[in-house]
């Protein structure tokens, strides 16, 4: 089963995207904060992570290391708000993240979620320390 984890404080957007994913047969897990979302990754394997750029408080390299430890091989799509500059989008792309600008087509997100061939289970032993360090 394809699962998407959405880490975003914008509840209206997450519910809208979540309903559209549900219509496509994709399970969705929602988190309001970055730390809550990372903790969800320890409990539930996912196929794709949709992360609001506003929820990120780590430098790009540390963010990439964290997701590589907690959810290796899982694509991370960063949602960049329309008002943010192109440099914000490029910053995430340089660290290997996919970036979508607002507004974005939910079907494009669904297509990204369907691409992975398998759901990767988290590595709880290595991930616990990474989560603790990121959520201090």
Predicted segments, located by residue:
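Alpha4 helix (beta4-alpha4-beta5 surface) of REC/receiver domains from two-component response regulators
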Residues: 62, 78-100, 107
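Acidic, metal-coordinating helix/loop segments flanking the phosphotransfer/catalytic sites
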Residues: 32-48, 52
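The C-terminal output helix
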Residues: 114-130
């Amino acid at each position: 089963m394809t699962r998407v984890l959405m880490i975003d404080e914008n509840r209206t957007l997450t519910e809208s995207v979540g309903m559209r994913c549900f219509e496509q047969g994709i399970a969705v897990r929602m988190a309001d904060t970055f730390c809550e979302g990372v903790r969800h990754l320890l409990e539930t394997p996912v196929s794709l992570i949709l992360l609001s750029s506003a929820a990120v408080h780590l430098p790009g390299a540390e963010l990439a290391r964290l997701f590589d430890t907690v959810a290796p091989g899982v694509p991370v799509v960063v949602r960049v708000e329309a008002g943010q500059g192109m440099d914000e989008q490029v910053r995430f792309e340089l660290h290997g993240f996919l970036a979508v600008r607002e507004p974005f087509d939910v079907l494009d997100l669904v297509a990204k979620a369907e691409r992975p061939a398998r759901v990767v289970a988290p590595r709880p032993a290595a991930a616990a320390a990474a989560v603790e360090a990121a959520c201090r």
